[in-house]
């Protein structure tokens, strides 16, 4: 079943963010663009490489009005311990959401019940709280923050320009397409 245009559910979870624990809720997400970046577990192998890659691009996400939330089924205490012990994770400036009850992972349909962890899922959420893009990778396949940034930018563009679409490999400032009978069979 597709998650596109699904409104995210109500939630309140604890996060580790900038040296402190704080609650994050759906109300904090609404009104701006957001990325929910689910990963299986703290203290693992592919996860820190992805989170570091995302940390290196965080300023670019912020510049386009997009907040990033990493999410695992670990507690906020485990997030802090990982942050304090890993040079890669110390680079994170975005909130690390704790989902020990699996409520978020279940709402986003990435919970692996037999393992008690989330799949490697990425969700772009618009300011109205609806999922507009997502992908779920196999556990051993890491994601690319540059491509995720491009996807968010494309989602923002089509959100603002409803009659235009972004073709493959589109980058901000590049040519877009408009729905037109003249294009049928011409591409």
Report each predicted region and the residues it spans.
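Chalcogenol-based redox active-site neighborhoods
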Residues: 1-187
């Amino acid at each position: 079943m597709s998650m596109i245009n699904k409104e995210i559910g109500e939630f309140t979870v604890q996060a580790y963010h900038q040296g402190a624990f704080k609650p994050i809720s759906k109300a904090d997400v609404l009104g701006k663009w957001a990325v929910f970046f689910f990963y299986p577990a703290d203290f693992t192998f592919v996860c820190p490489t992805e989170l570091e890659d995302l940390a290196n691009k965080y300023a670019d996400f912020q510049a386009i009005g997009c907040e990033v939330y990493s999410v695992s089924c670990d507690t906020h205490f485990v997030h802090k311990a990982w942050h304090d012990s890993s040079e890669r994770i110390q680079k994170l400036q975005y909130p690390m959401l704790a989902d020990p009850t699996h409520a978020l992972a279940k709402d986003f349909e990435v919970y692996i019940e037999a393992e008690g962890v989330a799949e490697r899922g990425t969700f772009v959420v618009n300011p109205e709280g609806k999922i507009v893009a997502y992908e779920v990778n196999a556990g051993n396949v890491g994601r690319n923050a540059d491509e995720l940034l491009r996807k968010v930018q494309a989602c923002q563009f089509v959100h603002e320009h409803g009659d235009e679409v972004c073709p493959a490999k589109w980058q901000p400032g590049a040519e877009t397409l408009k729905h037109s009978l003249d294009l049928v069979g011409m591409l």
